[in-house]
Amino acid sequence: MQLYDMHSHILPGIDDGAPSVEKSLVILNELKKQGVTNVCLTPHFYTNEISAEDFAAKRQHAIDRLMPQIPDGMKVVVGAEVYVTRYMFNGDDFSCACYGNSNYILTEFAYTSQFSSHTMEYFVKLTENYNMIPVLTHVERYPALINDPSIIGELKDMGVIIQTNTNSYTKKASFFSKLKLIKLIKGGYIDVIGSDAHSLTHNDPRTFTEALDFISAKCGQSTVRKMMGNAEEIFNSAL
């Protein structure tokens, strides 16, 4: 089974993740040691602060610095973690934020969001007006969703993919938080997983297999295989 990391901040010097190529390679090599050979590079794209054109240029500079040094045996896909705001929908082309050549787009919202009808309208616009498939990042950070899985169900009915972070399943993570997440996984609410790695101290990438082992122990190895299969579909569509 190939392992896929669907969310990371490894591109150098573009956001609050790796500040240099050297630090980027440290994270990539730690993932590789665990057998993670397919990695999505998804720097923050704050749509209320920077245009899509300027973001793409800034990201390209980081890509040009890192790509020649990607470790042997690793594949990477470039995308973005897009903070969704009304400024996205001003007529600009933001397809550059999708995973590679795919129409999947990693999306983030304010953690205090109640996922009201106004927020849901953003998902409608992305899916119907832009023909994109939103991937909602780190579902565990939205209390409104964790406390009311029916809203997650509404999102999934719209075709939204739900992502969770590996560090939410480690020994250091809250027992009750893990309990809620495992219930969501068993209920079919969570589709893919990512490290969200910024460094070895901020969302440590070395927790990847620990998380998969925990999920496997609680939900079965077939669940992990399904999550990786979902990730593989997105990753391959981006190549």
Briefly describe each language-model feature range.
Residues N29-K32, T127-E128, I185-K186:
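Non-catalytic positions within long, well-ordered alpha-helices that form the structural scaffold/packing
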Residues F208-L239:
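Mid-to-C-terminal alpha-helical segments outside catalytic/metal-binding sites
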Residues Y189-P205:
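Short acidic/histidine-rich active-site segments
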Residues L3-M6, V39-T42, V77-E81, V135-T137, ...:
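Active-site neighborhood of phospho(di)ester-bond hydrolases with catalytic His/Asp-centered motifs
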Residues I50-Q163:
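Extended substrate/RNA-proximal surfaces in nucleic-acid metabolism proteins
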Residues Y46-E49, Y83-T85, E140-L145, Y169-K172, ...:
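Active-site environment of divalent metal-dependent phosphoester hydrolases
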